[in-house]
């Protein structure tokens, strides 16, 4: 083959290879483009998608606390809790408190207390001996824990208070203001729902313990008047934090303060403090229509402090050592009574529960 034909042949072969290579590249480009188009189409293809959002909340069980059962028969008592607040307060932040009490819902028990707006071993704790001051508040914390700013919940401005749970929400009652014009503020689930104004303008005050709830209604007893003479006493019926009925007791020669109330067989019984002239405790029992009966615990085991030595009981005020007094409680059961009282007859020291079957 002459040189010219060789050159032409080699050039033709190179041209064919180049054309084939070009066609392969074009095919590759077309393949990539088609593949990309298919993926893009799939990404934008409309498909029915279920996008239902289910909002889940922690359900809080609501019940009706009927209170229709009678008190359980028991043979003794056991200690439930102790917070050791004074000991812990020597190093930790613990409130200066008085008037503590426990109240339970169907889900939890809480300790309620009246603070003095100060901590133990702090400069503001000096002079915190007054029963009524603008610094006092009702607060609560889990039962058994020392009351501190870190575990306590504000409930109400108060120097006298009560609280209870109806099966749905907490009801709190906080009394504050001047002695001649105090006001009780009712809160239900933390919201102010009603008020009760002092009707005798002489230190309106209430239980310093839990109110009692029966079939969705809650009941409390309040006092307005002298602490050493005849005063005025009212029972209040509340529903969802609002007063729906009240009645003033016709109770001459009786003195009711700081009542301790409990439901019993669909009714409510309260055992109270006579600060006027009784070393035994007055009681009032009423139904849900506020029809009531009154009396004094007749037992010769006297429950107040100061008090005389045990002896012959009286169904009226036992006047021996009858002046002054202390909050306390008793549980009437059948013809007998469980009496809670101080061990000392003349000082607020010690505690004991005594069963008097008569």
Swiss-Prot record:
Superkingdom to which the source organism belongs = Viruses
The active-site annotation reads 131
Q: Where is this region: Hypervariable stalk region?
A: 36-70
Q: Where is this region: Head of neuraminidase?
A: 71-358
A single Pfam family, by name? Neur
Looking at the UniProt entry, the stretches that span the membrane are 7-27
Q: Which UniProt keywords are present, listed alphabetically?
A: Calcium, Disulfide bond, Glycoprotein, Glycosidase, Host cell membrane, Host membrane, Hydrolase, Membrane, Metal-binding, Signal-anchor, Transmembrane, Transmembrane helix, Virion
- Its primary localisation, in coarse terms, equals virion
At which residues is glycosylation annotated? 68, 126, 215
Entry EC no(s): 3.2.1.18
Notes on the domains: Intact N-terminus is essential for virion morphogenesis. Possesses two apical sorting signals, one in the ectodomain, which is likely to be a glycan, and the other in the transmembrane domain. The transmembrane domain also plays a role in lipid raft association.
Q: Subunit composition?
A: Homotetramer.
Q: What is this protein's function per UniProt?
A: Catalyzes the removal of terminal sialic acid residues from viral and cellular glycoconjugates. Cleaves off the terminal sialic acids on the glycosylated HA during virus budding to facilitate virus release. Additionally helps virus spread through the circulation by further removing sialic acids from the cell surface. These cleavages prevent self-aggregation and ensure the efficient spread of the progeny virus from cell to cell. Otherwise, infection would be limited to one round of replication.
Q: What else is known?
A: The influenza A genome consist of 8 RNA segments. Genetic variation of hemagglutinin and/or neuraminidase genes results in the emergence of new influenza strains. The mechanism of variation can be the result of point mutations or the result of genetic reassortment between segments of two different strains.
**Protein's name in the database:** Neuraminidase
């Amino acid at each position: 083959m002459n040189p010219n034909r060789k050159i032409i042949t080699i050039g033709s072969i190179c041209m064919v290879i180049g054309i084939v290579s070009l066609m392969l590249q074009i095919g590759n480009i077309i393949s990539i483009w088609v593949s990309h188009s298919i993926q893009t189409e799939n990404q934008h293809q409309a498909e029915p998608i279920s996008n239902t959002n289910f909002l889940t909340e922690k359900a809080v069980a609501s019940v009706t606390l009927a209170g229709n059962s009678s008190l359980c028969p028991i043979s003794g008592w056991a200690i439930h809790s102790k917070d050791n607040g004074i000991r812990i307060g020597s190093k930790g932040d613990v409130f200066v408190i008085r008037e503590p009490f426990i109240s339970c819902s169907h889900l939890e028990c809480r300790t309620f207390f009246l603070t003095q707006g100060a901590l133990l071993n702090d400069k503001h704790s000096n002079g915190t001996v007054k029963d009524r001051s603008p610094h006092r508040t009702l607060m609560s914390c889990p039962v058994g824990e020392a009351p501190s700013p870190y575990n306590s919940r504000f409930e109400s401005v108060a120097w006298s208070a009560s609280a209870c749970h109806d099966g749905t929400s907490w009801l709190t009652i906080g009394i504050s203001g001047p002695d001649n014009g105090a006001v009780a503020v009712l809160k239900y689930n933390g919201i102010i729902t009603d008020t009760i104004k002092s009707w005798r303008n002489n230190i309106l005050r209430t239980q310093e313990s839990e109110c009692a709830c029966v079939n969705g209604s809650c009941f409390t007893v309040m006092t307005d008047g002298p602490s050493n003479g005849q005063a005025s006493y009212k029972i209040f019926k509340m529903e969802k934090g609002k007063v729906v009925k009240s009645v003033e007791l016709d109770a001459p020669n009786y003195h009711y303060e700081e009542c301790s109330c409990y439901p019993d067989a669909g009714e409510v019984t309260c055992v109270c403090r006579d600060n006027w002239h009784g070393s035994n405790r007055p009681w009032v029992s009423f139904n849900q229509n506020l029809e009531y009966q009154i009396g004094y615990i007749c037992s010769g085991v006297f429950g107040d402090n100061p008090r005389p030595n045990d002896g012959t009981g009286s169904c009226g005020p036992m006047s021996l050592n009858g002046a002054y007094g202390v909050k306390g409680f008793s549980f009437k059961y059948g013809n007998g009574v469980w009496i809670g009282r101080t061990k000392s007859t003349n000082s607020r020291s010690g505690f004991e529960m005594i069963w008097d079957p008569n």
